[in-house]
């Protein structure tokens, strides 16, 4: 059952709402325009609030749904977390879009919401506060994601290993943003 759900999660995660919505509405491919990221923040820059919100909700749901299904199937919390990670991997490396996807932040938030809602709320609050203070989405993601690890270690240690892997993946996907942050070139809203 685990591997079936992991494959389902990867295939679901491979649906890029940013790319699909941009194609449906005649907007530029987010991988080729703006920041080059197939995610909600770049959709906000390229296509406006409505499509950005739809992208955000779609990406959240594709992280949340596999975790909830894994829970209903009776998988352990750690297995649920690994299933959720496969959804994020689908977002990062989508099968349907030549393995060029987004950075996984919204999909990871959906995954975390399904695993342990208090950690998701902590991450969302940290992201919102950091974004409010800095107007920099990448910095907000880089602060919010690792902040969940101590809470998970304390409350849900079974999920710590998959969430640590997730954190490393998100930091790795933001490596260009980190270079730009340190060089003072990162984009702000």
Swiss-Prot record:
Entry's localization field: Cell inner membrane
GO CC, alphabetical: plasma membrane
Keyword Transmembrane among record annotations: yes
EC nos: 2.3.1.275
The protein's annotated pathway: Lipid metabolism; phospholipid metabolism
Keyword Oxidoreductase: no
Biological process per Gene Ontology, one example term: phospholipid biosynthetic process
Pfam family, one: G3P_acyltransf
Residue ranges crossing the lipid bilayer per the database entry: 1-21, 51-71, 77-97, 111-131, 151-171
Keywords for this protein: Cell inner membrane, Cell membrane, Lipid biosynthesis, Lipid metabolism, Membrane, Phospholipid biosynthesis, Phospholipid metabolism, Transferase, Transmembrane, Transmembrane helix
EC supergroup of this enzyme: transferase
Subunit structure: Probably interacts with PlsX.
Family: Belongs to the PlsY family.
Chain's role: Catalyzes the transfer of an acyl group from acyl-phosphate (acyl-PO(4)) to glycerol-3-phosphate (G3P) to form lysophosphatidic acid (LPA). This enzyme utilizes acyl-phosphate as fatty acyl donor, but not acyl-CoA or acyl-ACP.
Name used for this protein in its record: Glycerol-3-phosphate acyltransferase
Organism: Pseudomonas fluorescens (strain ATCC BAA-477 / NRRL B-23932 / Pf-5)
Gene: plsY
